[in-house]
C-alpha cells in the first residue's frame, strides 16, 4: 500500500478505527502483520491532528511512525526496553502505550512531558531530552539484566545527528568490550535539528554509495545483496566482506542495513530475525523527517516543531520584539565586519542560536561541530591560542556538557573566548531537561571568567561587545524568546567590567529602605514590583541592575548598605549557589549584617508549563516578587 501524503494539518479528529482499539502494545501485537500499514497511516493522521491542537515537535515524529509500530509489534514492551535518544520523536510511542487521549496536552502545564519520562509511564524506560545518552543507558540496562539473570531485549533508537557525539561511540566501544546483548537502531534522516555535518555524515553517505544492503534471513543470518534503491553497476562485484565494511563493524557491532524505515512489514521481519542473534547489533534505517506531510518533507528544519493552530483573527498582528538569539546573530555579523579575527562555533544549533545569517555571510568563519559540546569549547581554546577571537554560541543546558573544558582548557589558560549562552533561565514547554537554571552556579566559581546578564535586548548587544573586547574568557547569559521591545543601539559600546547601574529609586528621601539587586531578565519585573510596594507602603526602594554576576559590583552594595533595612536579590536561576548566593558571600565577607531575601528558582526541577506560568509558579513574576518582599518587610517592621 503506498504511503498517504497530506498537505494540510487536519482541524477535525481523523477516523482511526484500528488505532482507537490500541491502548497497550499487546493489542497492537494481536493484529495481523498486513494491518500494520493501516495502523501506521492512522497514527500519522492522528499525530498531525494532535500536533495541530497542542503544538510541539513535529517532523521527527512523522519520520518514525512505521519504526515505532514495528518496534512495539516485535518486542515485548515494557519487559523489553526501548530507549529513545533525545526523545523528540517519542509521540507515536506515547500514543501506542496508552496516552493517545492525553497527547493534546503534551508540553502543557500538568500535561504529558515533551520527552519520555520514567515517572509518566512504565514504557518510558529512561528519561531523555539531551542527545546521545541512549546507548550508554541501554548498555547499563543490558548489563544489569545479565547480572540479575533476567535477560531482555534492549533497543536504543538513535538519530544520525546524535551519533556524532563522542558519548555514543564511548558506549558502543564499551558494549563490544562486554559483548552485550544490545540493539542500536540508527535512524538516518540526514538531519539533527540542523543538517548533519562532519565526517560521520560523509561516512553514512559512503555506505549508501556502495550500493549494498546487509540483509538478514529468517534464521538471523546476514547476507549481502544489491540495494533495491540502486541499479546494478560494477561496484556490486565487491566481495561481501568489503561491501559491508564500515565504522560500526570496525568497532565490533554486527551491522545490518540500510533498510527503508517506512516499510513497516520489512522492519518487522528484520527485528524478528535479529532477536535470534546475540551481541551488539546495529540496524541502519533511512527515514524522511516529516514523512507523509508534504510541507515538512520539503522543509524539515522549519517543521522541526510547530505551534498549535489557533482560530484566524481579523485583528492586526502586532510585531514582536526581536528574539535574543536574533540579537546575538546580528551582533555576531556586525562584530565580524569590524574584526576579521572573529570565528563562530556552534554545536549543531545554527538556527536556534540565530547564526544562519552569519553562516551565509561568513562561511569560512563559521564552524558547526555537530553535537559535540566538549569539542566545541576546546576547539575555541585552540583557536584562541593562535591569536583569533572565537565566539561559542551554546544553550545553557548544553554548556553543562562542556564544563571540564570550560575550566581546564579555557579559564585555566585565561584564553580569549566569548560565550553567548542562550536559553538561560526557564524555557517553558520543553520543561526541566532544557532549563538553563544552573549556569551561574557552575560558572561563578571558575577563576578568570567574567559573567554578564542583560536586562533587555539592547544591553545584551552591548554586553556581547564588552565580552568580545575583554581579554580573557567572558560569558553573556540571555533568555529564550523575545526581548522587551526597547530600542537597540546600533553603535557598539563597552560597559565597565563589574559595574552595576541604579535603574529605579522610589522615595529616596525615606529612612526606611529596601534595596533590590536584580540580575538579567528579572530587572524589569523587579522595577514593577518595587513601584507597587513603594506606593502601597510608602517606603523607599532602590532597584539595581547588577549586570555582572562576576565580578560583582561590591562598591554599589557597600554604598547602599548603610541606609538599607532589607536586601533582596532576584534572579531567574536556581536560588541555591546562584547570584544571590554571591551577594550573601560578599555581605558576610564585608561583615554587613543586614536581612537578605534571595528570590530565584526553588531547589526542584520545575515542571513544564508556559514561561509565564512557570515564573508565576515559583513566585518570580511581579506579583510574586511583591508578595515575597512584603511578607519579609512586614516582619522586619513588626520586630522594630
Curated annotation (Swiss-Prot):
<keyword id="KW-0479">Metal-binding</keyword>
<comment type="subunit">
    <text>Homodimer.</text>
</comment>
<dbReference type="GO" id="GO:0052865">
    <property type="term" value="P:1-deoxy-D-xylulose 5-phosphate biosynthetic process"/>
</dbReference>
<dbReference type="GO" id="GO:0030976">
    <property type="term" value="F:thiamine pyrophosphate binding"/>
</dbReference>
<dbReference type="GO" id="GO:0000287">
    <property type="term" value="F:magnesium ion binding"/>
</dbReference>
<keyword id="KW-0808">Transferase</keyword>
<feature type="binding site">
    <location>
        <position position="189"/>
    </location>
    <ligand>
        <name>thiamine diphosphate</name>
    </ligand>
</feature>
<dbReference type="GO" id="GO:0016114">
    <property type="term" value="P:terpenoid biosynthetic process"/>
</dbReference>
<dbReference type="InterPro" id="IPR009014">
    <property type="entry name" value="Transketo_C/PFOR_II"/>
</dbReference>
<keyword id="KW-0460">Magnesium</keyword>
<feature type="binding site">
    <location>
        <begin position="129"/>
        <end position="131"/>
    </location>
    <ligand>
        <name>thiamine diphosphate</name>
    </ligand>
</feature>
<protein>
    <recommendedName>
        <fullName>1-deoxy-D-xylulose-5-phosphate synthase</fullName>
        <ecNumber>2.2.1.7</ecNumber>
    </recommendedName>
</protein>
<dbReference type="InterPro" id="IPR033248">
    <property type="entry name" value="Transketolase_C"/>
</dbReference>
<feature type="binding site">
    <location>
        <position position="373"/>
    </location>
    <ligand>
        <name>thiamine diphosphate</name>
    </ligand>
</feature>
<dbReference type="InterPro" id="IPR005477">
    <property type="entry name" value="Dxylulose-5-P_synthase"/>
</dbReference>
<dbReference type="InterPro" id="IPR005475">
    <property type="entry name" value="Transketolase-like_Pyr-bd"/>
</dbReference>
<feature type="binding site">
    <location>
        <position position="160"/>
    </location>
    <ligand>
        <name>Mg(2+)</name>
    </ligand>
</feature>
<comment type="similarity">
    <text>Belongs to the transketolase family. DXPS subfamily.</text>
</comment>
<keyword id="KW-0784">Thiamine biosynthesis</keyword>
<feature type="binding site">
    <location>
        <position position="293"/>
    </location>
    <ligand>
        <name>thiamine diphosphate</name>
    </ligand>
</feature>
<dbReference type="GO" id="GO:0019288">
    <property type="term" value="P:isopentenyl diphosphate biosynthetic process, methylerythritol 4-phosphate pathway"/>
</dbReference>
<dbReference type="GO" id="GO:0008661">
    <property type="term" value="F:1-deoxy-D-xylulose-5-phosphate synthase activity"/>
</dbReference>
<keyword id="KW-0786">Thiamine pyrophosphate</keyword>
<dbReference type="InterPro" id="IPR020826">
    <property type="entry name" value="Transketolase_BS"/>
</dbReference>
<dbReference type="GO" id="GO:0009228">
    <property type="term" value="P:thiamine biosynthetic process"/>
</dbReference>
<dbReference type="GO" id="GO:0005829">
    <property type="term" value="C:cytosol"/>
</dbReference>
<comment type="pathway">
    <text>Metabolic intermediate biosynthesis; 1-deoxy-D-xylulose 5-phosphate biosynthesis; 1-deoxy-D-xylulose 5-phosphate from D-glyceraldehyde 3-phosphate and pyruvate: step 1/1.</text>
</comment>
<comment type="function">
    <text>Catalyzes the acyloin condensation reaction between C atoms 2 and 3 of pyruvate and glyceraldehyde 3-phosphate to yield 1-deoxy-D-xylulose-5-phosphate (DXP).</text>
</comment>
<feature type="binding site">
    <location>
        <begin position="161"/>
        <end position="162"/>
    </location>
    <ligand>
        <name>thiamine diphosphate</name>
    </ligand>
</feature>
<feature type="binding site">
    <location>
        <position position="88"/>
    </location>
    <ligand>
        <name>thiamine diphosphate</name>
    </ligand>
</feature>
<keyword id="KW-0414">Isoprene biosynthesis</keyword>
<dbReference type="Pfam" id="PF02779">
    <property type="entry name" value="Transket_pyr"/>
</dbReference>
<dbReference type="Pfam" id="PF02780">
    <property type="entry name" value="Transketolase_C"/>
</dbReference>
<dbReference type="Pfam" id="PF13292">
    <property type="entry name" value="DXP_synthase_N"/>
</dbReference>
<feature type="binding site">
    <location>
        <position position="189"/>
    </location>
    <ligand>
        <name>Mg(2+)</name>
    </ligand>
</feature>
<dbReference type="InterPro" id="IPR029061">
    <property type="entry name" value="THDP-binding"/>
</dbReference>
Amino acid at each position: 500500500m503506498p504511503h498517504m501524503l497530506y498537505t494540510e494539518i487536519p482541524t477535525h479528529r481523523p477516523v482511526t478505527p484500528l488505532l482507537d482499539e490500541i491502548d497497550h502494545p499487546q493489542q497492537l501485537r494481536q493484529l495481523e502483520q498486513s494491518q500494520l500499514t493501516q495502523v501506521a497511516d492512522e497514527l500519522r493522521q492522528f499525530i498531525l491532528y494532535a500536533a495541530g491542537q497542542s503544538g510541539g515537535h513535529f517532523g521527527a515524529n512523522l519520520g518514525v511512525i512505521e519504526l515505532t509500530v514495528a518496534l512495539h509489534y516485535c518486542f515485548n514492551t515494557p519487559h523489553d526496553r526501548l530507549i529513545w535518544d533525545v526523545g523528540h520523536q517519542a509521540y507515536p510511542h506515547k500514543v501506542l502505550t496508552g496516552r493517545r487521549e492525553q497527547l493534546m496536552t503534551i508540553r502543557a502545564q500538568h500535561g504529558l512531558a515533551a520527552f519520555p519520562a520514567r515517572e509518566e509511564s512504565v514504557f518510558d524506560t529512561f528519561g531523555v531530552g539531551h542527545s546521545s545518552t541512549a546507548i550508554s543507558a541501554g548498555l547499563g540496562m543490558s548489563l544489569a539484566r545479565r547480572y540479575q539473570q533476567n535477560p531482555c531485549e534492549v533497543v536504543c533508537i538513535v538519530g544520525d545527528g546524535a551519533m556524532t557525539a563522542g558519548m555514543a561511540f564511548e558506549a558502543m566501544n564499551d558494549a563490544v568490550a562486554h559483548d552485550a546483548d544490545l540493539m542500536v537502531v540508527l535512524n538516518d534522516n540526514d538531519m539533527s535539528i540542523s543538517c548533519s555535518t562532519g565526517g560521520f555524515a560523509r561516512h553514512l553517505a559512503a555506505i549508501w554509495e556502495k550500493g549494498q544492503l546487509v540483509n538478514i534471513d529468517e534464521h538471523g543470518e546476514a547476507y549481502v545483496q544489491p540495494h533495491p534503491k540502486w541499479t546494478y553497476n560494477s561496484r556490486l562485484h565487491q566481495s561481501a566482506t568489503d561491501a559491508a565494511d564500515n565504522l560500526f563493524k570496525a568497532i565490533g557491532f554486527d551491522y545490518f542495513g540500510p533498510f527503508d524505515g517506512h516499510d513497516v512489514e520489512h522492519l518487522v521481519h528484520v527485528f524478528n530475525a535479529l532477536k535470534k542473534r546475540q551481541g551488539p547489533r546495529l540496524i541502519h534505517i533511512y527515514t524522511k523527517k516529516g514523512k507523509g506531510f508534504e510541507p515538512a518533507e520539503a522543509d524539515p528544519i522549519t517543521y522541526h516543531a510547530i505551534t498549535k493552530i489557533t482560530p484566524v483573527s481579523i485583528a492586526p498582528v502586532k510585531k514582536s520584539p526581536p528574539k535574543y538569539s536574533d540579537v546575538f546573530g546580528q551582533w555576531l555579523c556586525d562584530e565580524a565586519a569590524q574584526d576579521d579575527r572573529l570565528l563562530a562555533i556552534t554545536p549543531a544549533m545554527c538556527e536556534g542560536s540565530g547564526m544562519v545569517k552569519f553562516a551565509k555571510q561568513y562561511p569560512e568563519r563559521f564552524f558547526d561541530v555537530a553535537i559535540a559540546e566538549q569539542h566545541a569549547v576546546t576547539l575555541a581554546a585552540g583557536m584562541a591560542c593562535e591569536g583569533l577571537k572565537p565566539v561559542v554560541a551554546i544553550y545553557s543546558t548544553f554548556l553543562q556538557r562542556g564544563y571540564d573544558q570550560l575550566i581546564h582548557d579555557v579559564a585555566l589558560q585565561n584564553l580569549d573566548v566569548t560565550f553567548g549562552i542562550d536559553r538561560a533561565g526557564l524555557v517553558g514547554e520543553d520543561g526541566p531537561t532544557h532549563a538553563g537554571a544552573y549556569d551561574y552556579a557552575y560558572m561563578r566559581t571558575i577563576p578568570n571568567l567574567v559573567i554578564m546578564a542583560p536586562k533587555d535586548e539592547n544591553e545584551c548587544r552591548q554586553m556581547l561587545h564588552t565580552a568580545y573586547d575583554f581579554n580573557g574568557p567572558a560569558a553573556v547569559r540571555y533568555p529564550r524568546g523575545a526581548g522587551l521591545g526597547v530600542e537597540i543601539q546600533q553603535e557598539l559600546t563597552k560597559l565597565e567590567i563589574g559595574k552595576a547601574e541604579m535603574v529605579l529609586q522610589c522615595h529616596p528621601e525615606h529612612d526606611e529602605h529596601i534595596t533590590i539587586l536584580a540580575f538579567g531578565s528579572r530587572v524589569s519585573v523587579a522595577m514593577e514590583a518595587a513601584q507597587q510596594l513603594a506606593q502601597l507602603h510608602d517606603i523607599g526602594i532602590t532597584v539595581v541592575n547588577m549586570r555582572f554576576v562576576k565580578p560583582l559590583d561590591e562598591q554599589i552594595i557597600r554604598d547602599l548598605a548603610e541606609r538599607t533595612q532589607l536586601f533582596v536579590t532576584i534572579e531567574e536561576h536556581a536560588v541555591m549557589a546562584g547570584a544571590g548566593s554571591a551577594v550573601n558571600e560578599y555581605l558576610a565577607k564585608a561583615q554587613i549584617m543586614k536581612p537578605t531575601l534571595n528570590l530565584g528558582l526553588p531547589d526542584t526541577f520545575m515542571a513544564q508549563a508556559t514561561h509565564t506560568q512557570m515564573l508565576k509558579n515559583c513566585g518570580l513574576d511581579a506579583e510574586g516578587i511583591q508578595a515575597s518582599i512584603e511578607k519579609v518587610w512586614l516582619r522586619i517592621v513588626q520586630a522594630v
